[in-house]
From Swiss-Prot:
UniProt entry keywords in alphabetical sequence: Cytoplasm, Elongation factor, GTP-binding, Nucleotide-binding, Protein biosynthesis
Subcellular location: Cytoplasm
An example molecular function term from Gene Ontology annotations: GTP binding
Protein name from the UniProt record: Elongation factor G 2
UniProt cross-references to CDD domains, sorted A to Z: EF-G, EFG_III, EFG_mtEFG1_IV, EFG_mtEFG_C, EFG_mtEFG_II
Family indicated by similarity: Belongs to the TRAFAC class translation factor GTPase superfamily. Classic translation factor GTPase family. EF-G/EF-2 subfamily.
GO biological process: ribosome disassembly
Matches recorded under Pfam families: EFG_C, EFG_III, EFG_IV, GTP_EFTU, GTP_EFTU_D2
Taxon lineage: Bacteria, Pseudomonadati, Pseudomonadota, Gammaproteobacteria, Pseudomonadales
GO cellular component: cytosol
Record flagged with keyword Chloroplast: no
Binding site for GTP: 17-24, 89-93, 143-146
Region (Disordered): 293-314
């Protein structure tokens, strides 16, 4: 079967944004204008196509990334061919950043949606950082231009100041707030007005209003200069005072967008049906096809030092990345995969190179939100859901059996909050185990473990909302009723001092004894090093080599259980440099226990301290309540980082320990009579003040 759409006509894009910037509404409009939907769904009616989980429809937010395929030939059918869009709608709530992260990993370009009234918000900064990490070229779409306080050029300035990128407006607004009536296309230098009769599908072009002419010329000059900087040929033409043609302007802007030097900025109001078709045109003009992004890098499964790469080409060996696992009530497990190279036909066997297991692909479907169209093959650049995979988790590579490769994996953050869950009845016990393991398979930022001391099941995630939704899904999808305990903070422990400690385990009581003896030098690890950095400096065979791994294992086991209050110990450098052994009585177990005993002594000798997760908190409040809000943040051991004015009120930025933030949603609402809102995200671990740490250690009963 030949390729139906040439790869140059593909656009794999994500729609990403802050929680209320209007991302899902924008996606719904895209589906309407591209003819996938014949009727528009509205988020506030709970009818949006992309929000297909019940929880999403109830809460009016998007939790999982739904993937959809659509076609577009231009707002006035100006392109000679139909382009194929694979669109992923991502959540904007900070507890679900993991969904955004894994979407950006497999996309070629992104449309970042900002609210014209609220501008750059905390979550926009997070999304931007993630897009930088994966070098994703992007467009900025300033939405909600009909809202009170909307100001396109203010948002453009914020993108530059706060996100450190160079935005290049290619449109300007005509009117604002309730008088927002259209936009100026700076490339063509025409005013555009949308036709309400066909819900903004078509528009008419007119001359630019006289009062906006000077502003348009000023911003067009900025745009042309940005385009000219793409290459010497355009720059020379520009410097010699020649006019750049429309094609040259677009080519220059495209080249610089793909190189992540600039971000073209467009505007509109998705809800009022103004501007979305031009966003789609800009995706074609300025965002890359799969063949225009650098080849994806990977390593040889048998030799990590050996690097390899795959190009977006049907003739190269097959390779794909599984970026999401979802459970479907009708077909079981769906594995969403992005194909980077080669061709896969249903029924083929592939290798999961991360786990070293072969899998057979049963069926393949292309998703439109949660409706499915069955397909027979996928090719380089495609995004599809595979059915019948047995043992694939997020981030695994699927590849040709005879040409194995492991593609670069995704990093997932560790959870910062835990709660105990108990099934309400004995019958729920087994069902809960199955439900939690399925949910953990879908979501790498959600973890499940059993507390060894209390035998309780502990679930951990990225925030209170994240865990609420997990419990809700257990009830709805698996019929498990569960009680949940109070949230617990994921504290960590580390050491501040370098010290040398002797670990000795000797037991001689008839029969074969036990003898393990080692000297270990402990030190804080280098900045950014989380786990154990282990070195062996034993010389002269004072400890035989076969016992060294047991010493490392003893240290690692004790690190899991901590030395102060039972929290995991992180950031440790350990060097075993001396010791002794007994010909008969020494064993791996004896050395493991000796090393564990040495590690335990770090609580006194290593200056062990507790670390707590610190959150970046941003509160938006009317000025009248600002004093109360700031006083309250100070009481919560918050450090105020700064403040600024926005049309919505004062924005207060602070860093606050997570342990002080439980129940904050209720408190901030009652303080401000329901008018303040806040968002928070994890920034780093920091040392707990001694007075607070004493209480935590005492509570843990150590």
């Amino acid at each position: 079967m030949a390729r139906t759409t040439p790869i140059e006509l593909y656009r794999n894009i994500g729609i990403v944004a802050h929680v209320d910037a209007g991302k899902t509404t924008t996606t719904e409009r895209i589906l309407f204008y591209t003819g996938v939907n014949h009727k528009m769904g509205e988020v506030h009616d709970g009818a949006a196509t992309m929000d297909w989980m019940v929880q999403e429809q109830e809460r009016g937010i998007t939790i999982t990334s739904a993937a959809t395929t659509a076609f577009w030939q231009g707002s006035t059918k100006q392109f000679p061919h139909r382009y194929r869009f694979n669109i992923i709608d991502t959540p904007g709530h900070v507890d679900f950043t993991i969904e955004v992260e894994r979407s950006l990993r497999v996309l070629d370009g992104a449309v970042v949606v900002f609210s014209g009234a609220d501008g750059v918000e905390p979550q926009s900064e997070t999304v931007w950082r993630q897009a930088n990490k994966y070098h994703v070229p992007r467009l900025a779409y300033v939405n909600k231009m009909d809202r009170q306080g909307a100001d396109f050029l203010r948002v453009v300035a914020q993108i530059k100041q706060r996100l450190g990128h160079v935005p290049v407006p290619i449109q300007l607004a005509i009117g604002s707030e309730e008088n927002f009536s259209g936009q100026i296309d700076l490339v063509k230098m025409k005013a555009i007005y949308w036709n309400d009769a066909d819900q903004g599908t078509s528009y008419r072009e007119e001359e630019i209003p006289a009062e906006l002419r000077a502003l348009a010329e000023e911003w067009r000059a900025h745009m042309v200069e940005a385009a000219a900087e793409a290459n010497d040929e355009l720059m020379n033409k520009y410097l010699e005072g020649e006019e750049l043609s429309i094609e040259e302007i677009k080519a220059g802007l495209r080249q610089r967008t793909l190189a992540n030097q600039i971000v073209p900025a467009v505007l509109g109001s998705s809800f009022k049906n103004k501007g979305v078709p031009l966003v789609l045109d800009a995706v074609i003009d300025y965002l890359p096809a799969p063949s225009e992004i650098p080849a994806i890098r990977g390593t040889d499964p048998d030799d990590e030092e050996k690097h390899d790469e795959r190009h977006a080409d049907d003739d190269e060996p097959f390779s794909a990345l599984a970026f999401k696992i979802a459970t479907d009530p009708f077909v079981g497990t769906l594995t969403f995969a992005r194909v980077y190279s080669g061709v896969l036909t249903s029924g083929d066997a592939v290798l999961n190179s991360v786990k070293g297991k072969k899998e057979r692909v049963g069926r393949m479907v292309q998703m439109h939100a949660n409706q499915r169209d069955e397909i027979k093959e996928v090719r380089a650049g495609d995004i599809a859901a595979l059915i019948g995979m047995k043992d694939v988790t997020t981030g695994d590579t699927l590849c040709a059996i005879d040409k194995p490769i492991i593609l670069e994996r995704m990093d997932f953050p560790d959870p910062v909050i835990s709660v105990a869950v108990e099934p309400k009845t004995k019958a729920d016990q087994e069902k809960m185990g199955i439900a939690l393991s399925k949910l953990a398979q879908e979501d790498p930022s959600f973890r499940v473990k059993t507390d060894e001391e209390t035998a309780q099941t502990i679930i951990s995630g990225m925030g209170e909302l994240h865990l609420d939704i997990i419990v809700d899904r257990m009830r709805r999808e698996f019929g498990v009723e569960a009680n949940i305990g109070k949230p617990q903070v994921a504290y960590r422990e580390t050491i501040r001092n370098t010290c040398e400690i002797e670990g000795k385990f000797v037991r001689q009581s008839g029969g074969r004894g036990q003898f393990g003896h080692c000297w270990i030098r402990f030190a804080p690890a280098d900045e950014g090093q989380e786990g154990l950095e282990f070195h062996n400096e034993v010389v002269g065979g004072v400890i035989p080599r076969e016992f060294i791994p047991a010493i490392q294992k003893g240290i690692e086991d004790q690190m899991q259980n901590g030395v102060l209050a039972g929290y995991p110990l992180i950031g440790l450098k350990a060097t075993v440099y001396d010791g002794s052994y007994h010909d008969v009585d020494s064993s791996e177990m004896a050395f493991k226990i000796a090393a564990s005993m040495a590690t335990k002594q770090l609580s006194q000798k290593g200056g062990a301290v507790l670390l707590e997760p610190v959150m970046k908190v941003e509160v938006v409040t009317p000025e009248d309540y600002m004093g109360d809000v700031m006083g309250d943040l100070n009481r919560r051991r918050g450090l105020i980082q700064g403040m600024e004015d926005t049309p919505a009120g004062k924005v207060i930025r602070a860093e606050v320990p997570l342990g002080e933030m439980f129940g904050y949603a209720t408190d901030v609402r009652s303080m401000s009579q329901g008018r303040a809102s806040y968002s928070m995200e994890f920034v780093r671990y920091a040392e707990v003040p001694a007075s607070v740490a004493e209480g935590i250690v005492a509570r843990q009963g150590r």
